[in-house]
């Protein structure tokens, strides 16, 4: 994306930017703007979430941001302070990178709105990251939290209910010898209610290619890739909501 922007400015708007630096200097200056993109993403996300009533349906999940995959995942060393190697079960492959954890608000007949987003190393468990998210940035609304089985934890469920007024709903864990069909139907219903977050991840990836980061060469470059794209996504939704 940065290369395309740079080439477009150089080819079509150079008279407006006669002192356009080299591409390397251009990238360094963009990397210095990471805190600004972080702040803009938070501001625009807050503006989108302000429209909701006091009680909402949250959905929580994560998606991988991949710097290297398969055979190259074991030897990758870029941004080691943020990245590591893990296995992605949905893609059935090992990758080196980070996870983007997302707490979104479900909307009828529309893409959900992200209230909280957090980066972690790829190997961090989703439940561990979720606890950190709620501790560092308490949710702005009460209501329900739709999650998958990775978030099942009775102690955390009690904390959500007593401290945040949120009841977590997950697919039922099948017990040994349990053949109740109603349990399967319940789990299917929960999964269907969670489907919008998959649509959210697919949308942000198709529009902004956030999950593809093989071109990243530094920690600041990774942060720029993530937060500049998140800010762009929030701004896009703000003008199209």
Language-model segments: residues:
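Short alpha-helical elements
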Residues: 1-241
């Amino acid at each position: 994306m940065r290369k395309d922007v740079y080439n477009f400015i150089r080819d079509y708007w150079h008279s407006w930017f006669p002192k356009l630096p080299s591409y390397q200097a251009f990238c360094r200056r963009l990397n210095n703007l990471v805190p600004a993109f972080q702040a803009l993403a938070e501001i625009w996300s807050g503006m989108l979430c302000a429209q909701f009533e006091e009680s909402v349906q949250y959905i929580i999940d994560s998606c991988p941001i991949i710097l290297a995959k398969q055979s190259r995942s074991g030897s990758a060393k870029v941004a080691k302070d943020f990245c590591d190697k893990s296995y992605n079960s949905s893609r059935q492959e090992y990758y080196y990178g980070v996870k983007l954890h997302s707490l979104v608000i479900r909307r009828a007949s529309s893409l959900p709105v992200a209230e909280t987003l957090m980066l972690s190393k790829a190997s961090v468990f989703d439940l561990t990251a979720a606890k950190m998210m709620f501790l560092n940035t308490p949710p702005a609304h009460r209501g329900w939290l739709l999650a998958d089985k990775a978030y099942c934890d009775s102690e955390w469920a009690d904390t959500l209910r007593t401290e945040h007024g949120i009841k977590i709903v997950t697919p039922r864990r099948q017990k040994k010898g349990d053949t109740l069909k109603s349990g399967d139907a319940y789990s299917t219903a929960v999964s269907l209610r969670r489907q919008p977050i998959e649509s959210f991840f697919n949308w942000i990836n198709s529009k902004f290619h956030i999950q593809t980061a093989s071109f990243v060469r530094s920690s600041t470059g990774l942060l720029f890739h993530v937060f500049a794209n998140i800010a762009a996504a929030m701004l896009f939704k703000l003008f199209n909501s």
